[in-house]
């Protein structure tokens, strides 16, 4: 079996939470300003080290707050027992000459005493040396205390490999819905919100809700207009560095995430994950109204509009409304002018390439979409979907007047014309 490179293993297992160090309010109060500056330096360096490995790491709350100069997020004491921490996180602080007066040494000693013991304030934290023994302070001839920094002991300087205990750390928290595993309970809890739809973080400006605090933090920037990360090529700005990194690959053409099944490559891991569901058939997003499942959350969102009847995308020219922005874009091309895409076989023209591609299957006889129940094949996926309702008995389209349900949208439109005709008569 081929050896797995350290980078590959990191991409499969490491999250920022695995190498992050957080404090309670009481622990934070023991830190003097220079120690807090060191904490900021180490946390930002660890985060940047993981990002530099090509991992699609969303910007955590603590990093967002540190960059803004805010007080970093602290551990919730009531939930601290559920948090699984790395077993060998070194909390030795790198000594800087300016912090070694008597008061600072006392403050640092209190912090080290807190972090070195097993207590509810700091569970599972121990001070370790590289060989695994409990760390001790060494005195030089001048009496100065020398210590190792967190980033040095963890081997997380920029460009260095991640330590072995992180690479081999076991995932023991499993999602009961999809089987995906995580290092800790908090990561599992965040993941499970994709199944439950829970969004506990509300924007106080517009009321929009989010499943993750970091997503809310990025959204809040849209109200303030703050976009601190600008592209040097096109000047487009982004709310976080990871989004800028993905965007810059458009200019460089880099596609580091490749599908093992078909070889297709993508700019980011999320696009690869969505693509791989084509091969696996996974459909994790289920409609609570009709039970239909989808491979992408955006497709589920568009589908749910069928049940509500809401069409949020309206044409400015004629007022016609659509369920999806892609449908609106295709429609607006009709107002823009002559169709650009012409069929070489019959001369029929279309406003977009996808419509031309679908049309050309009439000439080629290509029917790639086959029903698994009866084997009947179709040239378009939407026609296969309508056909499968014959087998499932699904009738997702409801008449808003009488409540009668139908298997296709065209049937409900035809049915409603009867009411319109009766109204005219």
From Swiss-Prot:
It is found in: Nucleus. SMART domains: KRAB (SM00349), ZnF_C2H2 (SM00355). Transmembrane segments: none annotated. The keyword Hydrolase does not apply. Its main location: nucleus. It holds the Pfam family zf-C2H2. Keywords: DNA-binding, Metal-binding, Nucleus, Repeat, Transcription, Transcription regulation, Zinc, Zinc-finger. Residues 125-160 are annotated as: Disordered. One of its GO terms (cellular component) is nucleoplasm. GO terms for molecular function: DNA-binding transcription repressor activity, RNA polymerase II-specific; RNA polymerase II cis-regulatory region sequence-specific DNA binding; zinc ion binding. InterPro entries: KRAB, KRAB_dom_sf, Znf_C2H2_sf, Znf_C2H2_type. Gene3D superfamilies: 6.10.140.140, Classic Zinc Finger (3.30.160.60). A zinc finger (C2H2-type) spans 173-195, 201-223, 229-251, 257-279, 285-307, 313-335, 341-363, 369-391, 397-419. Residues 125-136, 144-156 have a biased composition (Basic and acidic residues). Residues 14-85 form the KRAB domain. The keyword Transcription applies. One of its GO terms (biological process) is regulation of immune system process. Belongs to the krueppel C2H2-type zinc-finger protein family. May be involved in transcriptional regulation. This is Zinc finger protein 2. It comes from Pongo abelii (Sumatran orangutan).
């Amino acid at each position: 079996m081929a050896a797995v490179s350290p980078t590959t293993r990191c991409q499969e297992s490491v999250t920022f939470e695995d190498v992050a160090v957080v404090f309670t309010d009481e622990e934070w109060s023991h830190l003097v300003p220079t120690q807090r500056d060191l904490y900021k330096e180490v946390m930002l360096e660890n985060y940047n080290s993981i990002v530099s490995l090509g991992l699609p790491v969303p910007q955590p709350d603590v990093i967002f707050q540190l960059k803004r100069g805010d007080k970093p997020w602290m551990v919730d004491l009531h939930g601290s027992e559920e948090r699984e921490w790395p077993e060998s996180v070194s909390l030795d602080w790198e000594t800087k000459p300016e912090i070694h007066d008597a008061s600072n040494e006392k403050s640092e000693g209190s912090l080290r005493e807190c972090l070195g013991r097993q207590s509810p304030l700091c569970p599972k934290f121990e001070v370790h040396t590289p060989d695994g023994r409990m760390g001790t302070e060494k005195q030089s001839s001048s009496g100065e205390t020398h210590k190792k920094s967190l980033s040095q002991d963890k081997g997380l300087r920029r460009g260095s490999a991640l330590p072995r205990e992180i690479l081999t750390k076991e995932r023991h928290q499993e999602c009961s819905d999809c089987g995906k595993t995580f290092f800790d309970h908090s990561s599992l809890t965040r993941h499970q919100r994709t199944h439950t739809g829970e969004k506990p973080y509300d924007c106080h400006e517009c009321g929009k809700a989010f499943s993750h605090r970091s997503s809310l933090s990025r959204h809040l920037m849209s109200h303030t207009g703050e976009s601190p990360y600008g592209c040097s090529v096109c000047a487009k700005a982004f709310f976080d560095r990871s989004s800028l990194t993905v965007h810059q690959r458009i200019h460089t053409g880099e596609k580091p995430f490749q599908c093992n099944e078909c070889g297709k490559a993508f700019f980011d891991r999320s696009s690869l994950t969505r693509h791989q569901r084509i091969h696996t058939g996974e459909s994790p997003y289920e409609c609570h109204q009709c039970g239909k499942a989808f491979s992408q959350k955006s497709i589920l969102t568009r589908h749910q509009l069928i049940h509500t009847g809401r069409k949020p995308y309206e044409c400015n020219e004629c007022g016609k409304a659509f369920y999806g922005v892609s449908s609106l874009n295709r429609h607006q091309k009709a107002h823009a002018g002559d169709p650009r895409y012409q069929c070489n076989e019959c001369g029929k023209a279309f406003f977009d390439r996808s419509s031309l591609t679908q049309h050309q299957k009439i000439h080629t006889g290509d029917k790639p979409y086959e029903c698994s129940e009866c084997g009947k094949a179709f040239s378009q996926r939407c026609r296969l979907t309508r056909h499968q309702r014959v087998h499932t008995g699904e009738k997702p389209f409801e008449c808003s007047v009488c409540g009668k349900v139908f298997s296709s949208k065209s049937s409900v439109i035809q049915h409603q014309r009867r009411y319109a005709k009766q109204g005219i008569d």
